[in-house]
Amino acid sequence: TVGPSMGKENISRGVQSTIWGFIAIIIMMALYYMVFGVISVITLSVNLLFLVALLSALQATLTLPGLAAIALTLGMAIDSSVLINERIRDEIRNGNTPQASISIGYKMAWGTILDSNITTMIAGLALFMFGSGPIKGFAVVLVLGILTSMFSAIFVSRAIVNYVYGNKRQISKLSIGE
């Protein structure tokens, strides 16, 4: 639902800016990371779907701070994909096989993803505990978004990568850009 404090124009601008940001992410990721970029965008879409479904299940009211938290969540979620993709690229450059590069890339990126998300979650929890009104709403959406982002980055993207580049397939090259 939409809170009474949000005017029609604010809703429209917030949604439009999020959509344009999402389109920019799609283009950049697909061009820069090729197949892995498309996988990242699919993962981001699933993350957004999880977050919206969770907010809907909780019957949360959409406010401007909540919309800002969703936009921030999208940025953090795609950052996790970039970390994973870059780790995989590093492992390919180190001479590992494509399958080994994927496996090592996910393992090596996990610590960084966890650290960055936990520190942001601590800030979100502090905002929730000590904030009021719109600040609490922002904090709730942020924390839920962090949880869905971490789940999506590790489990959803890995499942898609495994589907595309399954362990039993003989792969000589990954489509992840240079």
Task: State where each predicted segment sits.
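Small-residue-enriched core segments of transmembrane alpha-helices in multipass membrane transport
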Residues: 38-59, 70-77, 138-153
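Hydrophobic alpha-helical bundle architecture
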Residues: 29-33, 54-65, 70, 74, ...
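Interfacial segments of transmembrane alpha-helices in multi-pass membrane proteins
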Residues: 8-63, 129-133
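Structural signature of multi-pass, alpha-helical inner-membrane proteins
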Residues: 1-18, 168-172, 178
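Hydrophobic residues within alpha-helical transmembrane segments
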Residues: 19, 23, 42-45, 67, ...
